[in-house]
Amino acid sequence: MSTLSVIIPTLNEERHVGALLSDVASQSRRPDEVLVVDAGSTDGTIEVVRRFPFARLLEGRPPVACGRNLGGRSATGDVLVFLDADVRLPERFFEDFFAEFERRRLDVACPLYATLDSTPVIEGFHALFNLLFKTVQRTLPSGAGHCLAVRRKVFRVSSGFDPKLKFDDIELIRRLAKGRRFGIVEQRVFVSDRRYREQGTPRMMLRYALMALVFALGKFAWANRIDYEFGKHEH
């Protein structure tokens, strides 16, 4: 059985990272290693992480790609799982996700996603994206970067996440999938709807639709022009 390393980059995530680490601790299949890479939080993120003795804290720096790369280089598991700090996991997520991951002999994979306590409009929008990801998984590999699993040997021979790009996760999926097995796995993670709440549902839906078009064209540098703020997650 493959060993699992979970990598969680953080920057001012005291309101969210504790819930994720609690979910990790409650998994029916516990990961073999949990790395939290903090990029200089000024809130209580560090104190929250230290309440979980199984989590190894690393000192990183912005942007998030640098934290992901540091975690990926430091991890020892056969499979690396990159998680955003505001993700929530069902109790059997790792067990069920990796049963399918191994059965399909995947090298790179993303789950489906949904939001907790969200509106029907947002849920319908996410369902549409899930369907899109599943439909194009062999021809145009894409996925929600909230959760990304990749075999360590595949990650190590790549240049990792590109810190020059805002959407480094999607670009890495596309790059790693070339000549390898990529798949969308039927298990779900739950993501925060905070961007919709803070910036408005119509505005965020328009941004995500624009991103989808840019990613379909493979113009990841163009996506840097999209107004999409990172690294200020105090809310």
Annotate each language-model stretch with its function:
Residues 15-19, 43-51:
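Acidic helix N-cap motif at the loop->helix transition within catalytic regions
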Residues 22-31:
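Short, acidic, metal-binding catalytic loop of nucleotide-sugar glycosyltransferases
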Residues 30, 38-46, 87:
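A conserved acidic beta->alpha catalytic loop
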Residues 44, 85-99, 174:
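Acidic donor-binding/catalytic loop of UDP-sugar-dependent glycosyltransferases
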Residues 59-75:
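Glycine-rich, basic loop-to-helix element that forms the pyrophosphate-binding segment
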Residues 80:
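Short aromatic/hydrophobic "clamp" motif used to bind/position activated sugar donors
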Residues 92-121:
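Conserved donor NDP-sugar-binding/catalytic core segment of glycosyltransferases
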Residues 166-172:
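Acidic donor-binding loop at a coil-to-helix junction in glycosyltransferase catalytic cores
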